[in-house]
Regions:
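Walker A/P-loop
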Residues: 65-88
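Contiguous, well-ordered alpha-helical segments that form the cores/surfaces of helical PPI scaffolds
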Residues: 55-59, 81-93, 173
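Residue-level preference for the first positions of well-ordered beta-strands
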Residues: 68-70, 99-101, 153, 169
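Conserved RecA-like ASCE ATPase "motif II neighborhood" in helicase/translocase motors
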Residues: 143-197
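N-terminal accessory segments
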Residues: 1-67
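Post-Walker A helix-loop "phosphate-sensing" segment adjacent to the P-loop in P-loop NTPases
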Residues: 90-99, 122-125
Length: 205
């Protein structure tokens, strides 16, 4: 975007806003940095290779260049915030019809991130930029499951439970707790549940 040398501060500000919006649409990494203050107003965004890697790979999944992805990072690396909260909010900008199914070893954790995702989408920052892409369907408006007007939805479940939902994107964020991870029985339970239940919920891609 080229502006005349005499461009006013208001014009420069508007041009910068357009550039930032376009950057956030094209790059999940840019979206994460720009959206960070909405969800973590008291914590400064700190760039890092792990953030870049997560964003790069999740964007590749969205674009169909990666089918299956495992993310292993240290606790406190913003994995849940980036993967379970920001990712579906960003993907709905370009593909609002996507249907998501999220799970965790505790239902409360999956519910927490579902609420955070909706908070981000309903924020003035998001609505001012992409509020015309879709609206929430008020007839399908629950914390555990909400749907938009493009027929996309975000639903949650927990490890070990069944679900009748089908999805385009299936995410299990922490299938076991840190304590359970050392237990062969708990790992086997999580693996059996994933292979026997969650993996069968994916729509044909």
């Amino acid at each position: 975007m080229t502006l005349p040398p005499t461009a006013s501060p208001a014009m420069l500000q508007a041009a910068m806003r357009i550039q930032l919006k376009q950057s956030a649409e094209k790059s999940f990494r840019a979206f994460v940095e720009q959206a960070w203050h909405i969800l973590e107003p008291a914590t400064q965004f700190v760039p890092g290779m792990h953030v870049d890697a997560m964003c790069l790979h999740l964007q590749a999944v969205t674009e169909g260049r990666i089918k299956d992805l495992i993310i292993n990072v240290a606790p406190g690396s913003a994995k849940s915030l980036i993967t379970s909260v920001m990712w579906p909010a960003w993907a709905w900008i370009i593909r609002p019809e996507l249907r998501w199914l999220f799970s965790s070893y505790r239902a409360e954790l999956a519910l927490r991130d579902s609420v955070k995702c909706r908070t981000l989408i309903e924020s003035p920052w998001y609505q001012e930029r992409w509020g015309d892409r879709f609206k929430f369907d008020e007839s399908q408006n629950q914390a555990r499951r909400y749907q938009n007007t493009k027929m996309g939805y975000r639903a949650t479940t927990s490890v070990g439970t069944g679900t009748g939902e089908r999805c385009d994107v299936c995410v299990c964020d922490d299938p076991t707790s840190v304590d359970q991870a050392d237990s062969d029985a708990e790992r086997n339970t999580a693996n059996t549940w994933w292979l026997g239940t969650m993996s069968t919920r994916l729509n044909d891609q």
